[in-house]
Design a protein with these regions (language model features):
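Transmembrane alpha-helices and adjacent helix-loop boundaries
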Residues: 1-250
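The feature captures the beta-strand-to-loop junction immediately N-terminal to the Walker
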Residues: 290-295
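Helix-to-loop junction immediately C-terminal to a conserved catalytic motif
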Residues: 308
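Conserved ABC nucleotide-binding domain
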Residues: 326-327, 391-405
């Protein structure tokens, strides 16, 4: 079974990486539809592989064993599953409370802000996709060795909808919500299957769909964010400590005063037949403040979008610190040192003031996935927290750092 676990994890994560590279650049409902389509296609594929038993599946799967001790009964596997759930929750909490986790949560409001802070939205989405595949592979392995049988049936589109309902009932974006939602939906499903045949003989299958649909509508009406966030609003908030002084984060090399930093040469940006930026050229040197002045609709915001990579110029060249950034991704331009603000506020309302400001330290920090998951990033995290607090205190918001934005 342990070789099977290794193969399941590596193959699933590899396939998820390939599928993610192919589909994660899609936006909105197109992304959701593509993942559903992949699920249907792969389920149909495995259901027609003769070596895997087609839709009849594979039977006589050996139980999970530790040496000579085998977990034969469901009760024995039950405790193993809860141990794994506890470990996943701990790792998930560590990850979401880290540099990468803040970037993941910030994606909930769109790509524009995160890209402007030096965060590659595509890479973070791909990371989330692979982590989800890793957990799915682990769950499938446990399911197969607990049931001693596996087939494509339990992984069809209907189960996908059920998993979505679990997430929404418990609270999407909440670790505890995933567990609570799974427990509620599973218990309700079992109760409905037990009692509906007594109420309506011969029509229990249709009534089960009606019952779950009614439940779904009620949650959308009264607890749209899910049970855990809904209940959390009425519970006393945990008091969080104030960040302690910590070493400063590393700074990039500073240019010499008067050195040429930014050169824009003949920049032009068109939207169909409309020329928003027409043959603009200027230089910006270190220590210099340059203002772009013009009436509404003159193209000022479009020019800034071109400078920061949110838009591409149709003609011309933009050079920063001796390197052309005309075709660079927005996140790479931000990492190079060009920052921006927005006319319309793009704060993340479900993150605290401190966490919102800490997003700005992403390009100056380096902690990766494993260190974040195991909380090996305490020194860097402390520096990022203290830097964010220092900036909040500059504008008089230090006492409200843990308030939601």
């Amino acid at each position: 079974p342990w070789v099977g676990l290794l193969l399941a994890l590596t193959q699933t994560c590899s396939i998820a990486t390939l599928l993610g590279l192919a589909t994660l650049r899609l936006q909105g409902h197109f992304l959701s539809l593509s993942t559903v389509a992949w699920g249907l296609a792969i389920g149909f594929l495995f259901g027609n592989v003769e070596g895997l038993g087609r839709f009849n599946g594979i039977a006589s799967i050996p139980p999970i064993s530790f040496g000579s001790y085998a977990l034969v009964s469901s009760a024995q596997v039950y405790f193993l599953i809860w141990g794994i759930v506890a470990a996943v929750l701990w790792i998930g909490y560590n990850l979401l409370d880290s540099r990468l986790g803040r970037a993941m949560r910030a994606l909930r409001g769109g790509n524009t802000l995160v890209e402007s802070l030096g965060i590659s939205a595509f890479r973070i989405k791909l990371l989330i996709f692979v982590i989800a595949a890793f957990l799915a592979a682990l769950s499938g392995w446990l399911y197969a060795h607990m049931s001693r049988f596996i087939s494509p049936g339990p992984f069809d589109a209907g189960m996908g909808i059920e998993y979505l309902m679990m997430s929404m009932v418990g609270g999407a974006g909440s670790l505890l919500g995933g567990v609570v939602g799974a427990a509620i939906v599973t218990l309700l499903k079992n109760s409905v299957q037990d009692y509906l045949p007594l109420i309506a003989k011969g029509a229990s299958g249709q009534l089960e769909i009606v019952a779950f649909s009614a439940l779904f509508i009620l949650f959308l009406q009264w607890a749209r964010q899910g049970i855990v966030p809904f209940v959390g609003r009425y519970l006393p908030k945990l008091r969080r400590d104030r960040p302690q002084p910590a070493p400063a984060l590393p700074r990039r090399a500073q240019p010499a005063p008067g050195e040429l930093l930014l050169k824009v040469d003949g920049a032009e940006r068109r939207f169909g037949g409309l020329v928003a930026v027409n043959n603009v050229s200027f230089d910006v040197r270190s220590g210099e403040i340059l203002a772009v002045i013009g009436p509404n609709g003159a193209g000022k915001s479009t020019m800034f979008n071109c400078l920061t990579g949110a838009l591409r110029v149709n003609k011309g060249d933009i050079v920063f610190a001796g390197r052309s950034i005309t075709r660079e991704a927005q996140s790479r331009i931000a990492k190079a040192g060009i920052a921006r603000t927005f006319q319309h506020v793009k704060l993340r309302p479900r993150m605290s003031l401190l966490e919102n400001v800490m997003l700005g330290t992403y390009a100056r920090t380096r902690t990766g996935l494993l260190a974040s998951a195991l909380r090996l990033n305490r020194r860097e995290e402390a520096s990022a927290q203290f830097e964010a607090l220092r900036q909040l205190e500059r504008v008089g918001l230090g006492d409200q750092m843990h308030q939601l934005a």
